[in-house]
């Protein structure tokens, strides 16, 4: 290939980054409601629908609110984004792994909130890293981001096939492999949380050592820039929008 072609080629590291980013979430979230609600006799946790909503939706909403402060105030100003990404993912992976061994609603709720606060900023950090280093981000970023969607679909399909079924048979139509669900499938579903924790820690090591360095921006901006955003809540239309978004999230 010509030098120009090489210069405009997407670095494979960003494909790996985006795949692992969404594989971590896709491993456990699509089946979370089932193992959280399944009875303890079947190996589940026996939580109510209200409790499951708190664990999944409320924790995610709190994480999404905290994300701009962590990603914007810390990664963009004081710490290299790749290093910040690695730390958030490693600590989050440990929390996720510990969560898998908990059996009470309170433990799952607080650990899920802590995990969401750490994980949600990584979404914007991966986007920022890719956009900062891609030679032609307008054309190349959609392809890189699409790998994340492929990762979500792949792991959400592969884990149940490999770990929750037996006597698999191939078929030409999706999901391509079908079999008999194991009697203790709800109990084995919780293993997806453990695997997600391990994958997150491995991904963190990849981010620390493999991703390109991007220096934090020390542009003299206000230290507490998010205070300006909070001031917008005084505007009636913006306050209504925020309130509606929070209610929809719950």
PLM region descriptions:
Residues 1-9, 209-244:
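Juxtamembrane intracellular "pre-TM" segments in multi-pass secondary transporters
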Residues 4-62, 238-245, 249-250:
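Helix-loop boundary and gating motifs at the non-cytosolic
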Residues 19, 95-96, 105-125, 129, ...:
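Hydrophobic core of transmembrane alpha-helices in multi-pass small-molecule transporters
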Residues 38, 73, 154-193:
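Transmembrane alpha-helix termini and helix-breaking/packing motifs in multi-pass membrane transporters
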Residues 57-69, 153, 157:
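Residue-level signature of mid-helix packing/kink "hotspots" within the transmembrane helices
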Residues 66-80, 163-164:
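Helix-to-loop junctions at the C-terminal end of transmembrane segments
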Residues 83-97:
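Structural signature of the two symmetry-related core transmembrane helices
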Residues 159-163, 195-216:
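C-terminal membrane-cytosol helix-exit motif in multi-pass small-molecule transporters
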